[in-house]
Amino acid sequence: MTLAKALGSGAPLGAFLTKEFCSVLEPGDHGSTFGGNALTTAAGAAAAKVIVDEDIPELANETGAYFQGKLNGLSEKYEFITEVRGMGLLIALQMNIDIAGAAVTAALPEGLLINAVRPNMIRFMPPLNVTRDEIDEAVAILDKVLEETSK
């Protein structure tokens, strides 16, 4: 498995993970431009410590459940919302009408960044430290946007 991007919390850090029985690389077999950098390794260790100490996975699950609950509330208002699904804070809202692109365009000037992954599907990927107040604000904007774009 390869890991990168958030691993160093903004510092250029990547990792390659494998089971011990897959270990075939010997020292000197592989090199990279960012290999062995003490600063980025320290950043990665600090990021991992925060993830464990603050139980970020559980926080993401709890906050994601709250977000999905709010989106399910919108599905009661708008019959064209057919499904809300996700894991943690990676959430999708599926519709039976193709307004995702228009919703993205309408949401941006309101301060909400969302992604149309299909013509009928919006993806939400907020930061792991998103607050319930920010989720409430996002859902209020989305409510307004869906009302406008579904006419």
Predicted regions and their residues:
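Conserved N-terminal phosphate-binding loop of PLP-dependent enzymes in the Aspartate aminotransferase
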Residues: M1-K151
